[in-house]
Amino acid sequence: MHPFSQLFRNIQSLGEEEVQELLGPPEDALPLLAGEDLNHRVAGLNLQLPTADLDWVHQTNAITGLYSTQTAKFNPEWKQPDFPKIHLSEDLFLNYNNFCGPLTVNEKRKLKLNFPARFFPKATKYFPLSKGIKNNYPDFSIEHFFAAATYLWTLWESGILYLRKNQTTLTFKGKPYSWGHRQLEQHNGQQHESHLQSRESSSMVASSGHILHKQHASGPSSFPTRDLPNNFFGESQKSARTGGSVREKIQTNRLGFPGKSKITIGQQGSSQVSSPRSKSSNFRNQTQANHSSWNQRHPTWYSTTSNTTQSRQREETYSSDSAFKRHSPSFEHEKSEPSSSGLCGGTESLNNTGTSTFCLWRSFYNTEPCGAYCLHHIVSSLEDWGPCTISGDVTIRSPRTPRRITGGVFLVDKHPHNSSESRLVVDFSQFSRGHTRVHWPKFAVLNLQALANLLSTNLQWLSLDVSAAFYHIPVSPAAVPHLLVGSPGLERFTPSMSHTTIHGNNSKLQTMHNLCSRHLFNSLLLLFKTYGRKLHLLAHPFIMGFRKLPMGVGLSPFLLAQFTSALASMVRRNFPHCVAFAYMDDLVLGARTHEHLTAIYSHICSVFLDLGIHLNVAKTKWWGHHLHFMGYVITGAGILPQDKHVQKVSTYLKSIPLNKPLDYKICERLTGILNYVAPFTKCGYAALLPLYQATSRTAFVFSSLYHSWLLSLYAELWPVARQRGVVCSVSDATPTGWGICTTYQLISPTGAFALPIATADVIAACLARCWTGARLLGTDNSVVLSGKLTSYPWLLACVANWILRGTSFCYVPSAANPADLPSRGLLPALHPVPTLRFRPQLSRISLWAASPPVSPRRPVRVAWASPVQNSEPWFPP
């Protein structure tokens, strides 16, 4: 059925004879469809511009336009995902060689791009820590704040993020990579050799905050270490109580003079440095005691451990007694015995660098409640709130990392169909904007026709999903200052509280109770049921940098595509009779039988697990002969969109109001939805040309004719099938004639009036397809070869897409084109049509490795019939 039959019959300005002529033979109808007058008459019905007195429609039942924003919905019961301990094997290249032989040049190139991934932008803009967690949910700002902070700590627990300890030190959990060994300071509580060799000074501050002393020649020295629980967020574990020993060490101060000091060193595996039996007390008494002693010594809220002179201050700072007593108060809890190095006894404590930090949460112990909704009631309800911060297994040196962030974070639904789980969104858009934006490398995108040529086979299909695929790729430690995220802590909810309060100023004490409010009090009570004592840790500010590849950077999709394509190449070389390809985090396998596919799947899961690659077993899909990939259903007959996309298009089209001006934002969104299914319609993308013209900041009025025509067009979908070269012909054109040449005949029709040469060439190709039935056409017009007919008149472009659907084109130079003379009205002697090299679109996609033929020569010592068949290499159909 002609696609315009219903449309032409509903146009009142067209007579019956004119309609029959337009729907008649193609040699008569196609030149008329290219006429400017007819296209203007049809466009006048479908492109009515809105008058000035009509208001634009900004929202339909399913599509929102200008001035209608969709408010984000926060789910208080969002589930935090559990990330596996992702760590790619250090000897990945060696394991590759063991499993599938030597790596190819392309595989080496792709893997070297990812081990480690490097990211060094031209310029980096740093933002204050107060913008670390975006307030995208004003009604649930407190709940979203703690949920986002918990998500970041979960990523740190999984070894995906670094934790900034100071501007030159980072800590993380997991195993270090070889390229970071030179930056190691501490690994599993032991000082690393590279760090000891690089420091020639007599004393240094370790990553845990203790004082490390140079080994004396008289005897070995044991460094003070601490062990945190393996899972801080899980059940509290009882730490072994081991006594400490007091040893005297020769210490050289910073000025070079020797001196003696006493250091309390606990045994390995102990989390208590001082004697827990003699000094144990509950958290409340310890906090009050320290606070009262401070007030006796110092009249102001802030204090230092030094005397007034600078030399005395340096000596006290590096003295083990003064620093150690303040830094590690010992206390005990009935369930857990947290690490003393991370706990501050009073409202002020020493951090990892030896400077004083302010704990807002513990400050409420030492103040009187300001009312019924004071946070003092919550803080005083629990004896032990745990440490203010925690440290990882490994500590490394890093480039200067400021106390700033480079991108904010917020939580959203995992995907539109799963609102029970959350996903972290990181905004690193600064690297894609402005004159300093980073130009990301381009990579090939799968073409629809190429997918049909490669995958439209009768194979058994299986799709695998790499769990947290981006977080498999490590990032160079030097790139950490450019990929910083963080949380401002509880002080964010008090605008009047300054982060830069100097010593001797008690403004924090005065403004501390500005936090207290009924809303915050009730929210923290509810959050305490969820987070428990971890609420104290989340209330502290922190800064983290990405150790693995983040999803918010434009470089990430390119690197992930290189990584997964290398995995697919390994699978293809290890299983020659298997089809394997990858797109982003999806790995697709194909085999001739289900049993063969099951065996391949079992082996791949084992190999990937040995390499440190985690597969999401829950998302493994066995598709049979109907592969679902990228929203398409791929079968042996071709490719069609999934039913959910077809229903979505139908719903959106039916919700469009008629004879009302729609704003251009609605037109843009509707065009994007229709574009996804357009290749499967008769007229293709050309049917949406009127909508494309309306997206240029103008409104669009849907007439009943155009609306009903689109509904009928999208109600009948045709699959995109494989390109097969069977019958071929060659076409050429002049402004007044066409020429068609096949192996058996020459055709030379003429036109009634002159046409542009580009229009005549596409009409000649349509006539050759209609008269000869050839699916392989040769032409010398580059526009026809591209298949993009949207630059032609609208009616001609729609009909040409319908006629040339499923046709392949080959370039034939004009000098060698046998249809050149027939197009000029000359009929020479019939010559054989030149052989057209049919090259279907493959988009440089590799699906399989050629299976080498088996040698027909057998060893003489083999006395039985070999089960190996002598055959040619197998290629998938």
From Swiss-Prot:
InterPro entries: DNA/RNA_pol_sf, DNApol_viral_C, DNApol_viral_N, HBV_DPOL, Hepadnavirus_pol/RT, Rev_trsase/Diguanyl_cyclase, RT_dom. Mg(2+) binds at residues 465, 585-586. Keywords: DNA replication, DNA-binding, DNA-directed DNA polymerase, Endonuclease, Host-virus interaction, Hydrolase, Inhibition of host innate immune response by virus, Inhibition of host RLR pathway by virus, Magnesium, Metal-binding, Multifunctional enzyme, Nuclease, Nucleotidyltransferase, RNA-directed DNA polymerase, Transferase, Viral immunoevasion. Residues 233-242, 282-302, 338-347 have a biased composition (Polar residues). Residues 184-382 are annotated as: Spacer. Residues 393-634 form the Reverse transcriptase domain. Residues 1-183 are annotated as: Terminal protein domain (TP). Its EC number is 2.7.7.7, 2.7.7.49, 3.1.26.4. It catalyses: DNA(n) + a 2'-deoxyribonucleoside 5'-triphosphate = DNA(n+1) + diphosphate; Endonucleolytic cleavage to 5'-phosphomonoester. Residues 185-347 are annotated as: Disordered. GO terms for molecular function: DNA binding; DNA-directed DNA polymerase activity; metal ion binding; RNA-directed DNA polymerase activity; RNA-DNA hybrid ribonuclease activity. GO terms for biological process: DNA replication; symbiont-mediated suppression of host innate immune response. The keyword Transmembrane helix does not apply. Residues 383-723 are annotated as: Polymerase/reverse transcriptase domain (RT). The record marks 67 as: Priming of reverse-transcription by covalently linking the first nucleotide of the (-)DNA. Residues 267-281 have a biased composition (Low complexity). Residues 185-198 have a biased composition (Basic and acidic residues). Hepadnaviral virions contain probably just one P protein molecule per particle. Multifunctional enzyme that converts the viral RNA genome into dsDNA in viral cytoplasmic capsids. This enzyme displays a DNA polymerase activity that can copy either DNA or RNA templates, and a ribonuclease H (RNase H) activity that cleaves the RNA strand of RNA-DNA heteroduplexes in a partially processive 3'- to 5'-endonucleasic mode. Neo-synthesized pregenomic RNA (pgRNA) are encapsidated together with the P protein, and reverse-transcribed inside the nucleocapsid. Terminal protein domain (TP) is hepadnavirus-specific. Spacer domain is highly variable and separates the TP and RT domains. Polymerase/reverse-transcriptase domain (RT) and ribonuclease H domain (RH) are similar to retrovirus reverse transcriptase/RNase H. The polymerase/reverse transcriptase (RT) and ribonuclease H (RH) domains are structured in five subdomains: finger, palm, thumb, connection and RNase H. Within the palm subdomain, the 'primer grip' region is thought to be involved in the positioning of the primer terminus for accommodating the incoming nucleotide. The RH domain stabilizes the association of RT with primer-template. This is Protein P. It comes from Arctic squirrel hepatitis virus. The lineage of its organism: Viruses, Riboviria, Pararnavirae, Artverviricota, Revtraviricetes. The gene is P.
